[in-house]
């Protein structure tokens, strides 16, 4: 005796009472003959990979549902109760459907970024004890000197003695043209005693810049004290 092959379509037909109950829970009604027609003849023409013996693959059921719910003339509103019942059997399977439900594939891993090639380590440039030669630029101008170079040595006014100066007075000659003793330049002849006494009375003595003199005080006409350059005893 040969064994019959169980398919998703034959499995639903063998548990038709459960299929009607699940459809009722979705608020729809299904008929057995139209169930077979849509599963084996209509949905395979949607070109989404639906097999004639039916499937519990959730991705294929979702693709057929999109075709059925398409708006306009491309939709199939008469097939809505049947694809909704197939979806309920796959997403909330009863015990007799679980062995045929395809396990949900794991989510695809995100594409990993291509690994970049490792950069070779930077080699340390060899050190050299030689320094580059500094060449003067052609367009560089010489810096002006603060003091002009006169060829003579500079004198440090703080640490060195000043140079000797030439005496402006001419050297005295031994004798004048008359054969007598020449009087040194800048020296006046000695005055006579009588002239010195008369000059002392007429001219006031020259005040020395290094000494100070005190003059007597006299009361003026307005009652203020004034300095008098001489006293009555000097007369």
Curated annotation (Swiss-Prot):
Comp. bias regions, Pro residues: 108-124
Residue positions bearing lipid (N-myristoyl glycine): 2
Short sequence motif PPXY motif: positions: 162-165
InterPro entries xrefs: G_retro_matrix, G_retro_matrix_sf, Gag_p12, Retroviral_Gag-Pol_poly, Retrovr_matrix
Note: This protein is synthesized as a Gag-Abl polyprotein.
Described function: Matrix protein p15 targets Gag and gag-pol polyproteins to the plasma membrane via a multipartite membrane binding signal, that includes its myristoylated N-terminus. Also mediates nuclear localization of the preintegration complex.
Protein known as: Gag polyprotein
Protein species of origin: Abelson murine leukemia virus
Organism classification: Viruses, Riboviria, Pararnavirae, Artverviricota, Revtraviricetes
Record gene name: gag
């Amino acid at each position: 005796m040969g064994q019959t092959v169980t398919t998703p379509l034959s499995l639903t037909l063998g548990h038709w009472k459960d299929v009607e109950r699940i459809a009722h829970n979705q608020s729809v009604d299904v008929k057995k003959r139209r169930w077979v027609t849509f599963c084996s003849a209509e949905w395979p023409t949607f070109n989404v990979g639906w097999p004639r013996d039916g499937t519990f693959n959730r991705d294929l059921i979702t693709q057929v549902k999109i075709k059925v719910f398409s708006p306009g003339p491309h939709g199939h509103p008469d097939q809505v109760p049947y694809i909704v019942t197939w979806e309920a059997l796959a997403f909330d399977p009863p015990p007799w459907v679980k062995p045929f439900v395809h396990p949900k594939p794991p989510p695809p891993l995100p594409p990993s970024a291509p690994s970049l090639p490792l950069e070779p380590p930077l080699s340390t440039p060899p050190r050299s004890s030689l320094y580059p030669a500094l060449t003067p630029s052609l367009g560089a101008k010489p810096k002006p000197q603060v003091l002009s170079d006169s060829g003579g040595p500079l004198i440090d006014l703080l640490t060195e003695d000043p140079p000797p100066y030439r005496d402006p007075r001419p050297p005295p000659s031994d004798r004048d043209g008359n054969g007598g003793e020449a009087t040194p330049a800048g020296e006046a002849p000695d005055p006579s005693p009588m002239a010195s006494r008369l000059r002392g009375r007429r001219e006031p003595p020259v005040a020395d810049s290094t000494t100070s003199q005190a003059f007597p005080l006299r009361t003026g006409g307005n009652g203020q004290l004034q300095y008098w350059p001489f006293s009555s005893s000097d007369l």
